[in-house]
Every structure is written in C-alpha cells, then in structure tokens.
C-alpha cells in the first residue's frame, strides 16, 4: 500500500488539489475527508475495519466545472487504482451491451498494470544490466566468459576410459601452449566485448542489425468467468486465451531488428521475467479492494424522469439497479481472482440539467449519502484558471510554441478579455464551463500555431487588440459563435 497516504491530511489534500483546480472548495473538502477516512479505517482492528464502508459521493454541477478533474487528481495524489466510466455505456444484465460488473474487471486491470509498473521500476537497474549483456551476446557470440566456461571446461568422456579404449593424452608442452592460446583468445574477446560495451552506452551501434528471439508473454495463465450479459469482446478475448493455452501457448519467433529495437524488446522481456506475477496480482487485488476509486460520469443520463412515459428502459433504471449490489458490496469474478467491492469508493457525477437527483431510484440515492453541488464558473474564475494552476492553459500553449522558438507573452488585459468572452459565450449559448477556454485559446492562437515554423526567434505579445481582432466578431455574432465557439 502507498505509505505516504498516512501523512496526507484533508488540508494537505485540498492544498494539492488547489494547484490544479480553481474553486469548488465544498467538493474538494468532501473528497479529502473521504480519502482520509479510508486511511483511518486501515488503522483500525480488523473486526471493526470490515464494518466501516466508504461514504460514496454524488457530485452535482454543470459540465466543465471540475467534477472529473477532482476525481482524477485525487487518484493521482493517492496512488490508488482509478477508473472513469460513463453510466450510459452500460445496459441491464440480459441485454446486449456491457454489464456493470465489467467496471470492476477494468478497475482490477488498472490496478494490476499499476502495481506491475511499480515493481518493474524497482527492478529496472538490474534489467538494464542484463539487457546490456544480452545485446553484447548478440553482437559478439561466444564472448561471454560465464556462458562459455561450462562448454570449454568439459572433461573427457568417462565412458570411453572405462571401456578400455586407449586415450592419447597430449604432452605437457602442447597442453601449456593450448592453455596459453586459449587465454590469449579470451583476453582478446574480453577486450573486444568491453569496447563494444562502451560503444553501446554511447549509442554508436543503434542502427546495427541483430537477430532476437521474441518470447510469448511470461504472465501467469488466468481464467475468467462471465455473467450472462457480459460483453462479447470480453468473452472472445477469454476464449482466445484458453485456446492458446490448450494449443501449447504462443510460439517464440526470431526477428531481425536494429540494436535500438532489440534493447526495447529484451528490456521488456527481462522485466516481465524478473517480476513476480503472483505477488503483483495479490498486491493489486488488495489495493483495488481497499483503495480503489470508480468515477461514474453522466449518472444523470440514467435517471428516469417522473414525467417520462413508456416502458422500462434497459439503459436507465435497470442500470441503476444493477449498480446497487456492486456499490453496496459484492464479489465479482475477474481474470485475476474474485474482487470484493465493499470498500471501493464510488463517485458519481452528473450535470442534472434535464433530470434531478431525486429522479434516481431511492435505493441508488441511499448508496450515495454525500451530495456535493459544484458551482458554475464566472469570468473571475476563468481568469484564475488561465493563470494559477500548474498546468494553466496559457503555460501549456507558451511551452508548445517555444519548442519552435516562438515566445508568447499574455498581457493581463488580454487574460481579462478572454475570461470575459468565455463567460459571455457560456451565458448566451450552452454553458460548457472551463472547456470554453480551450476553444477560445485555439481560435486565438490559430495563425501563430500555423506559422510557428517560420517565426523562430520572434516574441508575440497577446494584448486586448489582438484578442478583439481574432474573436470579437465571432462572439458578437451569436449564430456564428454557436457553431465556432
């Protein structure tokens, strides 16, 4: 488990989220407390620990205000397995489409990949040494003393001596000469190997062609059991794996590649061979069960409005009912084993522009006791978004263009103008929140981005006049802004 989590207080969590997300303090506090409570639970005695379930969160707010970003940053901050899904992609069990249990299988796959990467990172130094030796073996066959020692030091066949066959032993002088010659050859090969080692490290042999043997994946064979409504892609993938095992598995193949490509292939194979896959599976399963986070977006789209007539909708109320046992706690079969969902944190989010949270079935509402309403963004918020976050849009575009030698400077007056225009367009058209800034920045810098390769060494100052020249006519023409911005 991630030990650093134990020292992350709610205040520290909010402070970290503030580096990337502007405003929405209520939502930040809610997720920070939820994260801290998980660490508190892990410190309790086992008999009490199992009784404490996470308090799932329902985020309510218009699009583009930071719902998804809060959950994503929280997962990165905690090092917990995180999965974002859209509620609209699932259908009721028994109908064509993905069943809701597949989100647990996907989360387990995320956890496995995360833990495997961490373990491989710890083994990377040794794997690099092994890879270097393997490359030298390919470039200079027979130059590895360790590998050739066994074959060069083989004794005479004992069976010949016991059968009475006369064996002519070489004279002492000829033996000494042979040993001297052998030692000379070994020294020469050793010197050549070291020269090649230096050249490898200096990347002077990257284009040289070598023949490598590509082995099939070293992963542990796994089986997965599916419910009746499982996705056909999952079933086909599982059947393909089973068929491969029954047929004796995938075969190794030889391929001519450059040293650069061979290094990547051998490195991946070394890491895969060195890592303990059973240990990875156990650790990943523990992390998913104790620290996993699933963010269910567009939950408002599966809320059936009370004024809506017609029969049951398999992608609405049925999906809510199928999610209930997973949120409450059930055991889901995956190819890595059975996963208990009791302590996975679920964060559901939706704009609820057409429906209301009360349109969700009562049982579903009860599984998400914490409700947080996110506020709509205004011009002042947009200004802060353009300037304050570590990954602010203005910083991103400036860094992108600087790769071509073009320096961009955004004046404060230009930032104010862009913020006002974003808020103005949002108020007149669909309110898409901070995502409007992406469109405005693209339109604003379109000419510079297109001609950047010919503007090396130039400095461009973005002021109010430039912003108005590029955007004012589009913003004022409501019909045009609806289609362009």
Swiss-Prot record:
Main location: cytoplasm
GO biological process, one term: protein unfolding
SMART domains, per the entry: AAA, ClpB_D2-small
Domain of life, per lineage: Bacteria
GO molecular function, one term: proteasome-activating activity
Residue stretches of biased makeup (Basic and acidic residues): 178-189
A single cellular component GO annotation: HslUV protease complex
Region (Disordered): 146-189
Subcellular location: Cytoplasm
Compositional bias of kind Polar residues: 149-177
Keywords: ATP-binding, Chaperone, Cytoplasm, Nucleotide-binding
Pfam families: AAA (PF00004), AAA_2 (PF07724)
Residues engaged in binding ATP: 22, 64-69, 297, 363, 435
PANTHER family: ATP-DEPENDENT CLP PROTEASE ATP-BINDING SUBUNIT CLPX-LIKE, MITOCHONDRIAL-RELATED (PTHR48102), ATP-DEPENDENT PROTEASE ATPASE SUBUNIT HSLU (PTHR48102:SF3)
Similarity section: Belongs to the ClpX chaperone family. HslU subfamily.
Purpose: ATPase subunit of a proteasome-like degradation complex; this subunit has chaperone activity. The binding of ATP and its subsequent hydrolysis by HslU are essential for unfolding of protein substrates subsequently hydrolyzed by HslV. HslU recognizes the N-terminal part of its protein substrates and unfolds these before they are guided to HslV for hydrolysis.
UniProt subunit comment: A double ring-shaped homohexamer of HslV is capped on each side by a ring-shaped HslU homohexamer. The assembly of the HslU/HslV complex is dependent on binding of ATP.
Official protein name in the record: ATP-dependent protease ATPase subunit HslU
Species name: Treponema denticola (strain ATCC 35405 / DSM 14222 / CIP 103919 / JCM 8153 / KCTC 15104)
Classification of source organism: Bacteria, Pseudomonadati, Spirochaetota, Spirochaetia, Spirochaetales
Encoding gene per record: hslU
């Amino acid at each position: 488990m991630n030990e650093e989590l134990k020292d992350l207080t709610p205040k520290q969590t909010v402070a970290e989220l503030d580096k990337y997300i502007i405003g929405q303090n209520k939502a930040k506090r809610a997720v920070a407390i939820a994260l801290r409570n998980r660490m508190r639970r892990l410190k309790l005695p086992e008999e009490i620990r199992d009784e404490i379930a996470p308090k799932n969160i329902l985020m309510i707010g218009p699009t583009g205000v930071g719902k998804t970003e809060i959950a994503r940053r929280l997962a990165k901050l905690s090092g917990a397995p995180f999965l974002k899904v859209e509620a609209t992609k699932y259908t009721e069990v028994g109908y064509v489409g993905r069943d809701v249990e597949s989100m647990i299988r996907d989360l387990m796959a995320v956890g496995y990949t995360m833990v495997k990467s961490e373990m491989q990172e710890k083994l990377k130094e040794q794997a690099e040494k092994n890879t270097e030796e393997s490359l030298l073996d390919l470039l200079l066959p027979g130059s590895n003393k360790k590998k050739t020692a066994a074959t060069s030091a083989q004794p005479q066949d004992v069976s010949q001596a016991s059968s009475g066959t006369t064996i002519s032993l070489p004279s002492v002088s000829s033996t000494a000469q042979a040993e001297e010659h052998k030692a000379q050859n070994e020294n020469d090969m050793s010197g050549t190997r070291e020269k090649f080692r230096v050249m490898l490290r200096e990347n002077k042999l990257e284009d040289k062609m070598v023949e490598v043997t590509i082995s099939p994946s070293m992963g542990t064979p796994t089986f997965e059991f599916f419910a009746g409504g499982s996705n056909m892609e999952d079933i086909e993938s599982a059947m393909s794996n089973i068929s491969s095992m029954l047929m004796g598995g995938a075969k190794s193949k030889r391929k001519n590649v450059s040293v650069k490509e061979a290094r990547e292939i051998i490195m991946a194979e070394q890491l895969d061979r060195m890592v303990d896959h059973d240990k990875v599976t156990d650790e990943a399963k523990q992390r998913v069960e104790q620290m996993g986070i699933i963010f269910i977006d567009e939950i408002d789209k599966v809320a059936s409005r009370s004024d809506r007539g017609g029969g049951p909708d398999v992608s609405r109320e049925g999906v809510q009912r199928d999610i209930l046992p997973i949120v409450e706690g059930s055991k889901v079969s995956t190819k890595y084993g059975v996963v208990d969902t009791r302590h996975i944190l679920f964060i559901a989010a939706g704009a609820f522009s057409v429906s209301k949270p009360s349109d969700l079935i009562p049982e579903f509402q009860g599984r998400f006791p914490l409700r947080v309403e996110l506020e709509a963004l205004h011009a002042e918020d947009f200004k802060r978004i353009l300037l304050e976050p570590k990954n602010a849009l203005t910083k991103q575009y400036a860094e992108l263009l600087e790769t071509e030698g073009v320096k961009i400077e955004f004046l404060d007056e230009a930032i104010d103008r862009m913020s006002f225009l974003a808020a103005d367009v949002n108020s007149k058209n669909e309110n898409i929140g901070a995502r409007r800034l992406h469109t405005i920045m693209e339109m604003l810098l379109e000419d510079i981005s297109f001609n950047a390769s010919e503007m090396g060494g130039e400095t461009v100052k973005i002021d109010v006049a430039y912003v108005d020249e590029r955007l004012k006519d589009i913003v004022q023409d409501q019909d045009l802004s609806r289609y362009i911005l």
